[in-house]
């Protein structure tokens, strides 16, 4: 809940050590103008639910280590800014990592492209992920 409700927050966020953080749930929820790169160590994070809900966030987070992730429900709910380009990168990047099965992931209205992104999305779904998004472009 670190920046939850900070509607005008759009500053660089650099944390020296997030390696022990378990939950980033609702971290930027309703920080409506937030759109800065995130370079967090997410290797221990299990919860990203509501993390970027209702934000203007459109950055590449395909490099987030999701090996411990168990829920990302409503992660991008009400976020209409997340671009196809960054969603494609996320799908391909996350599917290519070691990840848990049965993760609930909400990508808001983001849409994905055919080819590698569609294949990556199908791969996550075959690992029992529930993915809610805006569908294929």
Segments and roles (model prediction):
Residues 1-137:
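Negatively charged
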């Amino acid at each position: 809940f670190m920046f939850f409700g900070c509607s005008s927050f759009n500053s660089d966020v650099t944390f020296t050590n997030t390696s022990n953080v378990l939950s980033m749930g609702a971290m930027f929820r309703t920080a409506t103008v937030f759109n800065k790169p995130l370079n967090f160590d997410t290797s221990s994070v299990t919860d990203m639910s509501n993390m970027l809900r209702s934000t203007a966030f459109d950055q590449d987070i395909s490099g987030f280590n999701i090996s411990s992730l168990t829920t990302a429900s409503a992660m991008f709910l009400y976020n209409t800014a997340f671009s196809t380009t960054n969603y494609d990168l996320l799908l391909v990047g996350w599917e290519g990592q070691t990840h848990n099965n049965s993760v609930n992931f909400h990508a808001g209205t983001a849409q994905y492209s055919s080819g590698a992104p569609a294949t990556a999305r199908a791969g996550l779904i075959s690992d029992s992920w529930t993915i809610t998004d805006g569908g294929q472009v």
